[in-house]
Amino acid sequence: VSGHPYTIVRPGWFDYQGPEDRRIDLRQGDLVTGRPGVDRRHIAQVLLEGALNPSGTRRTVEVFSAAGAPVTDYEALFAATRADEPGVLDGVLDTNNVPLTEEPVRVRDDIARLGRRGT
């Protein structure tokens, strides 16, 4: 809503991955329920690569660890996800929870204030 670039990362359970889970698995739709787990190094890598790669911009992703080879092409990893819709509060595949007009005044004020920064 602010118009600033961002990458929102929602991790699975820290360090609950299996020994064969070497691949980063990005999903969307607010799917974090406790399982599957995620290697904390995968969380750090997704945070870093989301900031460095253009395809990571305006993304809300859940990150998990899965069986398979480690990711080497982070641009492609993020490109396989969908960008969030401009001006929408929720992630692209999230359930639309609360319309902005129904958010508390302090939340609406913060969003308006942060949207003015840098403009």
PLM feature spans:
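Amphipathic terminal alpha-helices
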Residues: 88-119
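Oxidoreductase cofactor-interface core, primarily capturing Rossmann-like NAD(P)-dependent enzymes
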Residues: 1-91
